[in-house]
Amino acid sequence: DKVSVLERFDHQLQESGLNTLHTIKPDFSWASTDISEIKNFYKFDKYILLFPFCSPHLTIKKWPHYNKLIELISNRFGDKYKILTAPGPSEINDAKDINALALLDNGKALDISQLTSLIKNSSFVVANDTGPAHITAHVGAKGLTLFGKHTTAYKVSIERENFKAIEVSDLNNLSAEKVFEKL
């Protein structure tokens, strides 16, 4: 299929007689909520947010070099930015393998509104092709998403003015240095 998902959706809605003013460029900012308690608890202001996780059955989407990227960011920026992750409920244990602060709300994964606020207010996001990457694209946050051969960024309508994709045939061969250059 050579048409992006949002273009297909727009066409279906138009065929149903619906107004599609915002279909091609959705804005998910309305889902934000106040996360000042979480920010105060973890004591962070400026931060880079990483989403190194993926569904267990879609490991082809998982880039394996997040810890090296964290090392490069830390070496370049020192303490200017906190490096954060926001694991989903099934990713909390996996977050222990990432050298970043895993944000939780009373020991639980953030809800969708908290996650949206965290993403929207970040300095930068680096994400696998996952739900948080799509939220990032549609709240206007700055960032990168990493795509292997599973699909294209165009097909899933993820690239925006502030959010770009790096597309490679094999995510295992995409170096942390190459990703760091795009930050």
Question: For the regions a protein language model found, what residue spans apply to each?
Answer:
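Catalytic machinery of carbohydrate-active enzymes
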Residues: 1-183
